[in-house]
Structure formats: C-alpha cells, structure tokens
C-alpha cells in the first residue's frame, strides 16, 4: 500500500497544468446489520485497513475522462513511477489504472466504497477490480490553493440536486450530510437493526465528515482498469 499519491495534469493554476498530492486515507466501515443475536462484537477484519504502515509513492498522469456518476467521476491514468522502500515496483503494476474521484459532497461515500473493496480483497482481480488504495487531502494543502481548479470537478454534468434525494426532514439527527443507509435513525424509538458494537464506525474520521465549500476534500480510489467503456447501447453489433 502506497502512502502518497501524485497525480500530474489533475489541476490548473492560472491556466497552467498542475499536480496534486494526496495521502493514503482510512476507509469508512459500515455498521453491522443484525437479524438476531444483537450486540455481538464485530470481527477485527470489519474495521478499516490499518494505513499506518503504508509507504512509498505512486505517481500517475491523468489521461481521459471515462464517465460521470452520482457520487464521482472516473478517469484513466498512466503509471509514471512507483517506489516503495527505494525499490522500483512499477513492473508489478499495469501501465494504466482507473481513478474514481469523489465529487465535492461525497468523499464520505467514497470512503465507504473503499471499505467494501477491502472487505472483498480475495475477489480482487477475479470478479472485481484490483484495489490499489484510497487517498484524500483537504484542498487547502494543495499548492496554488485557492486559485487551483481541480480538473475532475470541472464540466460537471449532474449537480448535487440532480443526483440526490431531498434531505431527510430529520437530517440534523444524522452524523453527516453525506448520509448513508446505516445513518438512518430508528423509527419512532424502535430498535435499529444497525449496530456498531466495536466502535469502528463512530471512531472513524469519516463519521462526522461534511463538505466544506471553502476547503473541500479531494478523495480518489485507485483501481485496476478493466475492459471497454460500457456505452449502454444494445443491439446485435454491440458485444
């Protein structure tokens, strides 16, 4: 696991291309859904992966935009360099990877997606893409801030209002505006099926994360790049 991610051509400052630098970040664990036997402790593997021992730097160059979704935007990126313990590990990586950047409002949700990749690690490279890490940083830490224009956030087709349901009436009871299904409070005092007996969720730095307009969080998942782009087209000529 790399501790630092550099992405070239990922921003502009005064019209000139600029790089961004992100640090490895813990993912955001889910609560546990109990059908019965409530209060059981969560297994240690349920927690986010320990990133304290991460080392090395992965350097990429942003290439082409793939697609925009509800919470993020995907790009291809070229692997420029990969060093760990002063050893060049680039030969162990593909030439090109996939980057999924969170939109400004959804870094918490992307942190949860990173946790799912950690949980299904044995399936990586088999039925799901290989996960190379989750990285994030406050925008204020980037050189050129606040005059930096972050490329993945430009030309946004779908706004927050277009892709998100109306906030719940009791959103003030939720730990974050970027709420997830396990944030929903119990209905009228009924016991919730979602529990956090081991504290993994509430102890996460993402538990009360919220989007800050003056200093948004940049976050990205680095994944194996799979096959051709899915166009949504159907027909005998489309495989």
Regions inferred by a protein language model and the residue ranges of each:
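ATP-dependent kinase catalytic cores of phosphoinositide-metabolizing enzymes
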Residues: 2-6, 10-13, 17, 25, ...
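Short linear interaction motif-like sites in intrinsically disordered regions of transcription factors
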Residues: 34-35, 47, 116, 154, ...
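Generic detector of short, locally flexible boundary/turn motifs and exposed helical patches
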Residues: 38-42, 93-99, 184-188
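ATP-binding glycine-rich loop module of kinase domains
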Residues: 48, 54-125
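Conserved structural core of kinase catalytic domains
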Residues: 121, 128-238
């Amino acid at each position: 696991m790399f501790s630092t991610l550099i992405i070239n051509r990922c921003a502009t400052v005064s019209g000139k291309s600029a790089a961004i630098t992100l640090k490895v970040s813990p993912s955001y664990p889910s609560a546990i859904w109990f059908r019965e036997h409530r209060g059981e402790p969560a297994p240690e593997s349920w927690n986010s992966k320990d990133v304290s021992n991460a080392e090395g730097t992965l350097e990429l160059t942003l290439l082409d935009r793939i697609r925009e979704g509800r919470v993020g935007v995907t790009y291809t990126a070229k692997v420029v360099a990969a060093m760990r313990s002063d050893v060049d590990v680039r030969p162990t990586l593909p030439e090109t990877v996939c980057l999924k950047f969170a939109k400004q409002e959804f870094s918490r949700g992307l942190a949860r997606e990173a946790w799912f990749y950690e949980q299904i690690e044995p399936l990586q490279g088999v039925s799901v893409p290989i996960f190379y890490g989750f990285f994030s940083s406050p925008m204020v830490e980037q050189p050129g801030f606040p005059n930096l224009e972050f490329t993945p956030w430009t030309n946004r087709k779908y706004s927050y209002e277009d892709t998100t349901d109306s906030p719940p009436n009791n959103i003030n009871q939720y730990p974050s505006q970027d709420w997830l299904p396990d944030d929903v409070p119990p209905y009228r005092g009924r016991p919730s099926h979602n529990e956090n007996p081991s504290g993994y969720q509430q102890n996460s730095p993402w538990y009360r994360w919220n989007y800050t307009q003056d200093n948004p969080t940049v976050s990205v998942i680095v994944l194996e790049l799979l096959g051709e782009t899915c166009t949504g087209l159907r027909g005998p000529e489309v495989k």
